[in-house]
């Protein structure tokens, strides 16, 4: 499945001697109880190729993408044995995600002015931020496709967290394969988390 592919691809891309996985525990980023307990998730991660599994504290795992990412980077940096950080995304290029992360980190005046103008329209902060980024980067079509995807949003926050924490970790983007976020189907053995949960609920395994 996707996580197994991610683990193997990450180790390959990094030329890693070992792999550390930081995963949420019994509660997910949506604030819901995980469909399997944290011990089962850790066991599956080890079976998939991880050498060490560390729980992302609930304080981070149920929080925003920004806090989720900051927690993960903080843990990996604190180990002093990790030099690369692999994350999943649906974007085609790491550079595209980095462009956005740089704006969010630097907060240039042009961007903040547009953001302030968008917020005055009464729209939500996430929507105002998305609009401001697209207008500031001057490529609405290109960045709309990136910013409209939850996996990309988390990837951007990881990249921003690396900058915020002045981390030495080298970012490695693993492109999502076959099935996109929230797709309820299986393609060549790949399924989204939503699809897997649905299969388990319907006991079609």
What would you call each of these model-derived segments?
Residues 11-12, 46, 73, 77-78:
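Non-catalytic positions within long, well-ordered alpha-helices that form the structural scaffold/packing
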Residues 1-38:
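N-terminal catalytic cores of NTP/NDP-binding nucleotidyl/phosphoryl-transfer enzymes
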